[in-house]
Amino acid sequence: MKAVVFAYHDIGCAGINALVAAGYDITAIYTHPDAPSENHFFGSVARTAAEHGIPVYAPNDVNHPLWIDRIKSAQPDVIFSFYYRNLLCDEILNSATVGAFNLHGSLLPHYRGRAPLNWVLVKGETETGVTLHKMVSRADAGAIVAQHRVAIAPEETALTLHHKLTQASSDLLKDILPVIKTGHFPEVEQDHSQASIFGRRTAQDGCIDWHATAQEISNLVRAVTDPWPGAFGYVGGSKFIVWKARALEGLQAAKAGTVLSVSPLVIATGGGALEIMTGQTENGVYMQGSQLAQTLGLVAGAIISSQPVSAIKRRTRVLILGVNGFIGNHLTERLLQDDNFEVYGLDIGSDAISRFIGNSRFHFVEGDISIHSEWIEYHIKKCDVVLPLVAIATPIEYTRNPLRVFELDFEENLKIIRDCVKYQKRIIFPSTSEVYGMCSDKVFDEDHSNLIVGPINKQRWIYSVSKQLLDRVIWAYGEKEGLRFTLFRPFNWMGPRLDNLNAARIGSSRAITQLILNLVEGSPIKLIDGGRQKRCFTDISDGIEALFRIIENKNSNCDGQIINIGNPDNEASIKELAEMLLASFEKHPLRNHFPPFAGFREVESSTYYGKGYQDVEHRKPSIRNAHRLISWTPTVEMEKTIDETLDFFLKTVELTEPQA
């Protein structure tokens, strides 16, 4: 049976050796070059491949068409991935006639994602294992073929557990590989409701929170001890690393981070006390805890912290252009709930953000971005993060005022981008789900889906293309001039303060606001082309939480990334949206103050939007990047969003006497 293998690390070596022992014909092995910054305590897949006389490659992008063609030309029966760090595209997965299999270091569906070895220790688990599963587009979500359980001892470290998992992988593969060879093997679908997903870990994740319990800190130490970078804390401005520690019970309570004794070195935590058994200063040598205390100049009663005293930073200054808009005002509210942020905003109106005026951390100027260029440049220079949210984003304007869309959405925003490059400021740019255009993929993926638009005479694409070109310009500035950026793509965010009913009266609003106006005025709800178009509707609170996490940018996860923000579970046609809205309207307490429902009316898009319009049948996001980079999953159901949006708008209407 011919196999193509993707592998890295010790488990990659174990997988290759198991395949050879089972008599598989490995035609090629794909691996990663060793990173100079990484501690190479593990075996080399490249060396293992060479010892077996198997061709080995380390492409920068294995999903490039050239590599896809090479893999397909090998006509593999099976594909195996053993700790390979990149996802494989569907074309590669589908090239294996029997199937593609991945070996994952946990008992799926638990601990999907990156670094499960470390995460299970951080979380204090007593059992883990390895899982061989079928590979599908969604990471770690395919049917389970085989599992091998591994007990976690109380004093287990990441390295000892790693060795156990490597042996478990060899044992599992020894049993299952001959079965796969027959073409008849078990496939048990995962219970996705039980899935847990974890992101990658970096050295900064070793920072000790002394307010955690002693057992939680001990678990962290075990999870990241040598050869990983280690758990760490600070005495004043000096960093120290903890290599071995244990939780103690029954000691006198004290403020978290307080040194209780120096021989042994014992620190008070948020629950119990922690004995530091071994550690070292940042540039020192490995030593016992009491010597570490002496080296750091510690005495009983001293305070240890989670960050250097000199690094306690000022608030992050966030510049929001278009702060009075739908996203801008909700984002401002979320940022002001966290004392770590200060908001500077510009917009041509202030009705939505008037509730923040007077907050000492909110600074607002009324103005137009096309006029106040000097103010904008000064504040880009002054602030840390820039969000240019000003844009014309209502479909009817794309055909009614295409040049104005281009001038504002592209030209004015390009100036802002260039100022961010000039002053080396981080930009979080609102791309759009519209950039995917008429893409035929079932779900739209930030890194792989094609961006397809219609002919030039369909002017509705001027918004999509303006945004796409800015995405490409920002990406190029990131590659060539070091611009720090994140592109986020909202998928049909809804909620209170989305447009307003006056905008809806002239057709310049999003779908739900237009539908609410029809109900309020007693006019027929117009279903463009029958309302068959499907969209994935996202609650504004879910969207803002994702955007807030992008601004936080823990471990710089979001730098240079594109992130879809949408709710694929809230997919509905525009007609279904209208029907759900009508049901909510009919049961609302204020219903009797409004005219009777006037029915639905189907309208051709060219009649409503003009001859330059063209629509898209579906638009569903992949949110894999959001899961992976910011640990985000939307939670609000569409019915709740509709109820809250309708309630907000009905309460803004000047009520008449109840209808008879």
UniProtKB/Swiss-Prot annotation:
Marked site: Raises pKa of active site His: D140
Region feature (Formyltransferase ArnAFT): 1-304
Chain residues that bind (6R)-10-formyltetrahydrofolate: R114, V136, S137, R138, A139, D140
Residues the entry annotates as binding NAD(+): D347, D368, I369
Keywords tagged on the record: Antibiotic resistance, Lipid A biosynthesis, Lipid biosynthesis, Lipid metabolism, Lipopolysaccharide biosynthesis, Multifunctional enzyme, NAD, Oxidoreductase, Transferase
GO cellular component, one term: membrane
MF (Gene Ontology): carboxy-lyase activity; UDP-4-amino-4-deoxy-L-arabinose formyltransferase activity; UDP-glucuronate dehydrogenase activity
Binding sites annotated in the UniProt record for UDP-alpha-D-glucuronate: 393, 398, 432-433, 460, 492, 526-535, 613
Region of interest: Dehydrogenase ArnADH: 314-660
Enzyme active site: H104, E434, R619
Catalytic activity field: UDP-alpha-D-glucuronate + NAD(+) = UDP-beta-L-threo-pentopyranos-4-ulose + CO2 + NADH; UDP-4-amino-4-deoxy-beta-L-arabinose + (6R)-10-formyltetrahydrofolate = UDP-4-deoxy-4-formamido-beta-L-arabinose + (6S)-5,6,7,8-tetrahydrofolate + H(+)
EC assignment: 2.1.2.13, 1.1.1.305
Pathway: Nucleotide-sugar biosynthesis; UDP-4-deoxy-4-formamido-beta-L-arabinose biosynthesis; UDP-4-deoxy-4-formamido-beta-L-arabinose from UDP-alpha-D-glucuronate: step 1/3; Nucleotide-sugar biosynthesis; UDP-4-deoxy-4-formamido-beta-L-arabinose biosynthesis; UDP-4-deoxy-4-formamido-beta-L-arabinose from UDP-alpha-D-glucuronate: step 3/3; Bacterial outer membrane biogenesis; lipopolysaccharide biosynthesis
Site (Transition state stabilizer): N102
Gene3D superfamilies hit by this protein: 3.40.50.12230, NAD(P)-binding Rossmann-like Domain (3.40.50.720)
GO-annotated biological processes: lipid A biosynthetic process; lipopolysaccharide biosynthetic process; response to antibiotic
UniProt family annotation: In the N-terminal section; belongs to the Fmt family. UDP-L-Ara4N formyltransferase subfamily. In the C-terminal section; belongs to the NAD(P)-dependent epimerase/dehydratase family. UDP-glucuronic acid decarboxylase subfamily.
Role of this protein: Bifunctional enzyme that catalyzes the oxidative decarboxylation of UDP-glucuronic acid (UDP-GlcUA) to UDP-4-keto-arabinose (UDP-Ara4O) and the addition of a formyl group to UDP-4-amino-4-deoxy-L-arabinose (UDP-L-Ara4N) to form UDP-L-4-formamido-arabinose (UDP-L-Ara4FN). The modified arabinose is attached to lipid A and is required for resistance to polymyxin and cationic antimicrobial peptides.
Alphabetical list of NCBIfam families matching this protein: PRK06988.1 (NF005414), PRK08125.1 (NF005998), PRK11908.1 (NF008872)
Record note on quaternary structure: Homohexamer, formed by a dimer of trimers.
Name of the protein in its database record: Bifunctional polymyxin resistance protein ArnA
Organism: Enterobacter sp. (strain 638)
Gene: arnA
